[in-house]
């Protein structure tokens, strides 16, 4: 079993460059299926396990997909006849695979997609995707582990109110509506920057979408979309993670291409904790204080505080003076990392949907297991300031969302390495796969 070993006590200094946003690239790649003419060229694609997974889904649907991990570019040609069924073996690894449902339904009037593992209707808002399709005239059948959608002719524009501002539902409905007949209005839409990025991509392809980034999105359907070129926005969650890394170590780190407008809620909370966030040409500089001051955080849909930064901020609050409270309102059961923090001597307790953090915890290195993607990063961050060695396992979660995080932290001054069960330094499997695919392409 691979693990990341961190030795605490090293201040971080230097410059780090962000990757393209994972949460933006997956829907953009799925949306490429709508283009019945031309090729799409997607730039600043992060070299992540999830990107390889969605590329395999697209290839299985008969799209031509080439990923050059060196230039971080994906070329997609979906102009040929596509398959309209995505089987379980390709979708089981990633819930975002359900995003191919809207594009296939809009283009062909039929789509059948396996339900990703653990994605039960009701507990996750995929029901909002399906209600949106039904409002546009589709017939939905759920059974035997699949979602099947059919419509006679074109989808019809509709007025759709989302019971909650689900990012995935907003994206899927927006993609489907791009080819629908007439006007679609999505109310209580998600406002995340990734929604805006997807709308920009669709509009470059020939769609007519206005209002992305607000609670009301209006789409006038068109006859067809064409392939285009698009650059993915920087990853705001990776930015937030490195902000915390600098702050927790009392460091001075410049985050290249970080965008303040995508990070206002995170910056606000960091500044409340005495962290300096300085605008510089091309990014943000984060200077950690001698003493961190605790604060309270409540996760909310954008532009509120992002749930994907909750666990990282928890690690920071472990080192802050005073008592802090984090309340999670977006997802259930997102405090599984608390028990791992306790193994590191954290003074922390759960009360309902809140966590109470008593600083200053004298953190001790321990063997801990990542429970999800962001928890993996949070445990590494805590390890940066722990006494002794922290060993983080279950790295499959980390590889879904962070590119070269070990190398990037090491370049900033962290004592950190990734090793196999024999203690030999290794790279993530997706990096090995990327090198092999590029060597094959070169041949």
From Swiss-Prot:
Kindly list the biological process annotations in GO that this record carries.
cell division; cell wall organization; peptidoglycan biosynthetic process; regulation of cell shape; UDP-N-acetylgalactosamine biosynthetic process
Indicate where this protein resides in the cell.
Answer: Cytoplasm
Reactions mediated catalytically: phosphoenolpyruvate + UDP-N-acetyl-alpha-D-glucosamine = UDP-N-acetyl-3-O-(1-carboxyvinyl)-alpha-D-glucosamine + phosphate
Listed pathway(s):
Cell wall biogenesis; peptidoglycan biosynthesis
Binding residue positions for phosphoenolpyruvate? 22-23
Q: Which sites are catalytic?
A: 119 (proton donor)
The source's superkingdom equals Bacteria
Checking Pfam families in the record gives: EPSP_synthase
Residues where 2-(S-cysteinyl)pyruvic acid O-phosphothioketal occurs? 119
Class of enzymatic activity (EC top level): transferase
Cellular component, GO, one term: cytoplasm
> Do you know which InterPro entries this protein is assigned to?
Enolpyruvate_Tfrase_dom (IPR001986), Enolpyruvate_Tfrase_sf (IPR036968), MurA_subfamily (IPR050068), RNA3'P_cycl/enolpyr_Trfase_a/b (IPR013792), UDP_GlcNAc_COvinyl_MurA (IPR005750)
EC nos:
2.5.1.7
- Annotated binding of UDP-N-acetyl-alpha-D-glucosamine, by residue: 95, 124-128, 308, 330
Would the keyword Mitochondrion turn up in this protein's UniProt record?
no
Gene3D superfamilies in alphabetical order: Enolpyruvate transferase domain
**Keywords for this entry?**
Cell cycle, Cell division, Cell shape, Cell wall biogenesis/degradation, Cytoplasm, Peptidoglycan synthesis, Pyruvate, Transferase
Question: What does the UniProt function comment say about this protein?
Answer: Cell wall formation. Adds enolpyruvyl to UDP-N-acetylglucosamine.
Give the UniProt family note. Belongs to the EPSP synthase family. MurA subfamily.
Protein name (database record): UDP-N-acetylglucosamine 1-carboxyvinyltransferase 1
Species source reads Oceanobacillus iheyensis (strain DSM 14371 / CIP 107618 / JCM 11309 / KCTC 3954 / HTE831)
What's the name of its gene?
A: murA1
